[in-house]
């Protein structure tokens, strides 16, 4: 992994970047340090891409670093599977753009203890490139330090062990329009609290029997300050820490201290954590930590139309087998988008175009699709493919005649290259490119009509062949070979141009035509989102492809001319069986 800074590029402008720019100008921090801290309890989705791009973008633009840290404080819901998936997704999204800013856990795994003013401090700070390993940060690596900090809060009279059940705790909490009640255990002595907390750690009590709570203000209008829990008992094996612990810190307690330990300067999160900021600050200031404290900033999350980003609802889609798994190309998960063939650069472009604001709103999915089309138009190799083939016979070509035609690989390239495609007596065209009784302004093939076969020549429809049931089986045409490239009549114009493949020089492949999963822009607003599933979100066809696609690469993207953009499917493909996934159609078929 390169640690060389990339060339300076103009950064988008938004309120968070303006704040950071001000801090850089006044030299408030030696280095800008951000973090992306997912909980490993699910797969990342398109909404997370905004946070990834913002946090890594801030580091990239300011020669800083961004830590990938797993906030793994709830072992009940977390799993190594998600750690591996999230790590792969993040590295895919930032590859070639900001991977030099990605900081991994330093060698030695744990921060060294520093003592200042008799208070424990385990500050880790920014990571030097030479110290990088390939393992991400884990909040669970700080459990020893977090436990010591909790003891400090108890000694200062700012935390206590509470025996209320979870249900009683919620009842005592009150409501937004009425104050909470103090726990009857709130005024235990420091000595008793220390003893009970240490016994909690030793595993003497069952799940839910006791918790450690902060002592703040049960009458606060901010519900998050009504003596929130700091630790709870969970006799569960942890995916990373094993069986060492049976007490686990709550997110709001662990998160701010993990930021501090890693030297994070700007803790950027979504608007749902606005009310949590007061607790974030309370924990840090209550411990009298000697080094510069991180600060939390909030921005609006990304919610695209025609999709869902709720983990619970995405899980329903998986469990109900509406989709094939978390990486189904119809899902907004990053693994699903990647499998569908979405370029990481297109996703970054989309996130940049949406911007960073303080107001939640629904983002038109067409904006995302436009970014994908624009990106793929620049990089995709053009190829010929026919999804719904019907045979067309060029009667003036000999049965074994082969005419080599030059086809452009990518007209958008600064130095376009070509390949050879074979024109033979029998070819396939799309069934809907022919109409025996054409509607008005139909410029494709019809009886007596002419069209151009792209890269080849103009043909004229002379005769139709049907079977005993009246089904069309063959279209017989004449090829005007004088209209080929280099021919005397190459400039002759016709209104329609069709794609095609040679019947004798083509290959068969399965093609999966993916579309939007929902029929309405806001499926989350529906009473039952399963009732607005698009029944045509996946259509599978056996297509005829030009022979060169037998050597297709998973690293390439392809435009099947006049059809859309496609990527090679690798997960379910088998030797000798090609599968292509449609990434996106050439045009927005949903536009009104």
Which residue stretches match the model-derived regions?
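Intrinsically disordered or highly flexible coil/loop and linker segments, enriched in small
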Residues: 29-30, 99, 159, 206, ...
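Glycine- and acidic
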Residues: 34-41, 66-73, 260-268, 328-334, ...
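Charge-rich, well-structured scaffold segments of protease-associated domains
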Residues: 83-92, 149-155, 174, 343, ...
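N-terminal Rossmann-like or analogous alpha/beta NTP/dinucleotide-binding catalytic cores
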Residues: 2-182, 245, 272-296, 301-306, ...
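Long, charged, mostly alpha-helical binding arms that flank functional sites
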Residues: 292-371, 375
